[in-house]
């Protein structure tokens, strides 16, 4: 298995090749040829807090303000569905409003940018004030820029998108490995 430095080098190479072929970076994980013809409805709606019913083993879902994960063991998952006639729910959690803000912010940051006014209007929070030191550090590290109410990932930021996120987690959620 390749180390992170190698994986980032591969991704950087892939970005260059796609950009030369006329594609644009759409998120830390996607490129598109023509933004006007491509709609990542699933991603964009989910990342902005819409409900999603999880249907696979160990899948995460979000319904009516509750986050949940299906069972991770295949036998238990199948048994719940076929023998017990119930959903294979493994665990669930009702996040606070602040946790919903954090969730939405970190997911949308993977898209490559954040509009500060969006969060002010939806959550009544100025994210540049709430996490000023975190954004400042990421800016100093060359991961993002902050201009005119917009936080924008740099290429370096896209290559390290997932590594940027934990500083925004609540303390009790940092350092946790999720299935």
What does each of the following model-derived ranges do?
Residues 150-154:
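Minor-groove-contacting beta-hairpin "wing" of winged helix-turn-helix DNA-binding domains
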Residues 125-139:
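Short amphipathic alpha-helical interaction segments
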Residues 1-125, 176-179:
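C-terminal scaffold of the Radical SAM
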Residues 139-149:
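A short, conserved structural fragment
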Residues 158-179:
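Short, amphipathic alpha-helical interaction segments positioned at domain boundaries
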């Amino acid at each position: 298995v390749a180390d992170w430095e190698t994986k980032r080098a591969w991704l950087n190479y892939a970005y260059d090749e796609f950009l030369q072929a006329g594609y644009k970076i759409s998120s830390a994980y996607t490129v598109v040829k023509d933004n006007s013809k491509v709609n990542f409805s699933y991603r964009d709606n989910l990342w902005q807090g819409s409900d999603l019913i999880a249907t696979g083993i160990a899948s995460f879902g979000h319904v009516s303000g509750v986050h949940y994960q299906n069972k991770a063991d295949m036998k238990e998952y199948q048994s719940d569905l076929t023998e017990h006639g119930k959903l294979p729910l493994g665990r669930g959690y009702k996040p606070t409003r602040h946790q919903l803000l954090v969730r939405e912010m970190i997911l949308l940051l993977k898209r490559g940018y954040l509009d500060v006014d969006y969060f002010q209007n939806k959550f009544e929070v100025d994210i540049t004030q709430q996490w000023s030191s975190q954004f400042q550090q990421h800016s100093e590290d060359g991961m993002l820029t902050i201009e005119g109410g917009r936080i924008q990932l740099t290429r370096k930021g896209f290559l390290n998108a997932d590594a940027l996120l934990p500083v925004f987690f609540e303390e009790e959620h940092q350092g946790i490995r999720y299935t």
